[in-house]
């Protein structure tokens, strides 16, 4: 089966890129399921029920999160009831929502695990030990398991790929908004890429308007960052081919579409 995984969707430009491109990519690559990171989809910070539903209408089947997933007030209530939106599993157990989920695609159960790194990130529980328990639980239901590690450090993401190699179908990184060129299938059959990149505005600084970002670097303070609204858009992600019976990855190809009006 072919899976499309999409990097951090940033604000309305990112959601518009989904509307324009996901259906075309699904047709072009014969995609059976699409998973996207949506923690920046609402105004660049967080997610709302409305923006989540908009992503689903654009062809996304399942949404993962990260350190901004709770930025919008009352989104925890939606997380508690939604079966297709998850947050990092290594948040404290009292946090709203779940860190894993499953959905059906082309007659196959697809398991999804969302984790958050600890290097240069807000404090959370150990993602490696958390992965051990939750991957074992998901494997009771399906061999096809996709892991989104939302993390800053490339080394932590590479380490997680090696750690889960042979136990999951794919480990991809999110958070930095910059796509890496290290996609591969690891020896145990796990597809890996350190970071999928960003789906959102091409201009600005990793999705944000450049002015306040430059002020922050030059003066140490600035106005609140806001999404770059003008200019071209981009969509970043990867297509992963998985053997549905074994859960082993057969290939991974980067996707980077630029110049989306």
Language-model segments: which ranges?
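Acidic, metal/ion-coordinating pockets
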Residues: 1-261
